[in-house]
Amino acid sequence: MSWQQYVDEQLTGAGLSQGAILGANDGGVWAKSSGINITKPEGDGIAALFKNPAEVFAKGALIGGVKYMGIKGDPQSIYGKKGATGCVLVRTGQAIIVGIYDDKVQPGSAALIVEKLGDYLRDNGY
């Protein structure tokens, strides 16, 4: 399965409004859904958050021009919120999965979608 298929089928196909997969080391965009534009500085910032996840509480997470307030930050998962929408970021060995949800999706459901893909990629060496 290609990285784009993971985004299309496992993230947006599962109900998230937007999704992307980035390189864990450099934050480069490997695949993304339409409607999300993660700039190089944003990708760098996302990758850097996983080096010091507690910073998400002070700095938030900037994704596609939207700043999300940090509500969870650990070396494996970062969650953010902005009003009724939010983001779930999950780091595997080689990738960072980005899931964006809108007000039609419960935060717990969004987290389950992204964490499940993260577990699958980790189990398969990514």
From Swiss-Prot:
What is one process in the GO biological process aspect for this record? Answer: negative regulation of phagocytosis
* SMART domains the UniProt entry points to: PROF
Q: Which domain of life is it from?
A: Eukaryota
Q: Kindly state one GO CC term assigned in the UniProt record.
A: extracellular matrix
Principal location: cytoplasm
Tell me the GO molecular function terms: actin binding; actin monomer binding; myosin I heavy chain binding
Q: What is this protein called?
A: Profilin-1
UniProt source species:
Dictyostelium discoideum (Social amoeba)
Q: What is the lineage of its organism?
A: Eukaryota, Amoebozoa, Evosea, Eumycetozoa, Dictyostelia
Q: Which gene encodes it?
A: proA
